Amino acid sequence: MATKGVAVGIDLGTTYSCVGVFQHGKVEIIANDQGNRTTPSYVAFTDTERLIGDAAKNQVAMNPQNTVFDAKRLIGRKFNDPVVQCDLKHWPFQVVSDEGKPKVKVEYKGEEKSFFPEEISSMVLTKMKETAEAYLGHPVTNAVITVPAYFNDSQRQATKDAGVLAGLNILRIINEPTAAAIAYGLDKGARGEQNVLIFDLGGGTFDVSILTIDDGIFEVKATAGDTHLGGEDFDNRMVNHFVEEFKRKHKKDIGQNKRALRRLRTACDRAKRTLSSSSQASIEIDSLFEGIDFYTAITRARFEELCSDLFRGTLEPVEKALRDAKLDKSQIHEIVLVGGSTRIPKVQKLLQDFFNGRELNKSINPDEAVAYGAAVQAAILMGDKSENVQDLLLLDVAPLSLGLETAGGVMTVLIKRNTTIPTKQTQSFTTYSDNQPGVLIQVFEGERAMTKDNNLLGKFELSGIPPAPRGVPQIEVTFDIDANGILNVSAVEKSSGKQNKITITNDKGRLSKEDIEKMVQEAEKYKADDDAQRERVDAKNALESYAFNLKSMVEDENVKGKISDEDKRTISEKCTQVISWLENNQLAEKEEYAFQQKDLEKVCQPIITKLYQGGVPGGVPGGMPGSSCGAQARQGGNSGPTIEEVD
């Protein structure tokens, strides 16, 4: 079937959602069954049915307590989050806590039901999926969904879960401003490097991202935003203003009447839009409360005054993003407006003044740009080879830390999670026993302290290392992730030039994205155990290193004559005793290793001090050399030689 390769891009917005598809070399933004290219992110429950989109929003005044919107302001948040608590005051529907998670409570077909925000969002996503299917004429399962750039892990994971609940295979979650930048970049077809600032102010969220776009490569330099700022907040200010006016004029408080408030909010939203093109808007609501008609007006100046702090607040993230990107405002080539709220003249003026009167770029449709970019990214991920997208590259991040196993089964991280890819990191390691002929390089991904708790990606042997005492050979290990997320690991022994490498692709052996998120969540739960284990291994390695270093130092030719045979024998025997104790106590507690270390220091320190005063070449080993020390490989499971980290 020729249709299997189609994937859609969905902008799941706070107030409106939008879906697009890339086919025949261009993006189509798909209109819904009402002929609208954006669909309200509303779900309503009635005595007989569930309504989604326009149908839900159209009946909101008659059924305010069972019409749910703003799920995006709840998703991935805790019930006691101050943001949620603040929003509760404005919502006509009821939100309750279910083990700390917010749930929306409604009446549906005469019964009380409660839904998680993910479930509400999944209903909106289902509507977008059906809109695309009606247009394309076949089922759609693959999708790219967008989220605000500063959405945290739980918000992203919850959004992804919503996609799964809607029966979608989420190819990727991408950031809204980045998606908008793709729309801008394709639209412009610009050549040469450009620093672009995306200013995305929507219905409920605000993002600022700075990207460098160069010949189809979109690299995010910095992002900032406000998790809770958008058109809804401007509506709230206007609603509060008119509630006060109604009180003054009619001596009645409509604040507790959900239906009246909802009708007023709808009128305020309409007035706000009118004020973007006119200097005054009128509000006429028949029988708003207790039979009283409410006829009034608001000027643009008054609206701007009501929201002045919110409007000014949009500039802080702009400044922060510029600082993080290490760019001056004069180095930004284009300031691109995205999101319906950027139509507000005052917002535009503040931004323009901040950039010293520069023209703002309004070339892309602010309501559709994000879905447009998501559709392009969906096509790329499905392997679309159209000439205008085949060279397009979005620089993503590595979702999990990558590293290798060092002495004692410790996970030594070379690439931290959330590092932009492509990236390359090199670190030096050494052997852990004398004349060791080879090392086993084992590559892991995960957030745990010990490799046994992480995911083994692959391993290879670097052999042919020239005979040398432990700690002498220098083995350089390089982790290199390319833009496809393909990891190449190479190792080279510096003196002999011997090298070997392995390629690890993001394929069947890797964890699914679900596992990734699960691991990150688990990692926090296990963090305490991890820390204790890391300290235990550090103490063991420190003791072993100290004992070996002392032993080899007193046996050194250069020390002959500077130390009596008796002292030499004392140190040598004590070190041998400790090394033998270590071999039999691989799994001792941190405190036992610390005790052994103190005991060893007590015996050796006076002799070392004497030696010091006599002046000794090469210095004296330190007490706790941290992670530069060797240890036996963890017992069981792992044959093959180990390697250890060098500071």
From Swiss-Prot:
CDD domains: ASKHA_NBD_HSP70_HSPA1
MF GO annotations: ATP binding; ATP hydrolysis activity; ATP-dependent protein folding chaperone; heat shock protein binding; protein folding chaperone
GO terms (BP aspect): chaperone cofactor-dependent protein refolding; protein refolding
InterPro entries from the UniProt entry: ATPase_NBD, Heat_shock_70_CS, HSP70_C_sf, HSP70_peptide-bd_sf, Hsp_70_fam
Residue ranges the record marks as coiled coil: none
SUPFAM superfamilies hit by this protein: Actin-like ATPase domain, Heat shock protein 70kD (HSP70), C-terminal subdomain, Heat shock protein 70kD (HSP70), peptide-binding domain
Region annotated Disordered, chain positions: 622-647
Record's keyword terms, sorted: ATP-binding, Nucleotide-binding, Stress response
Family: Belongs to the heat shock protein 70 family.
GO cellular component: cytoplasm; cytosol; nucleus; plasma membrane
Protein name: Heat shock 70 kDa protein
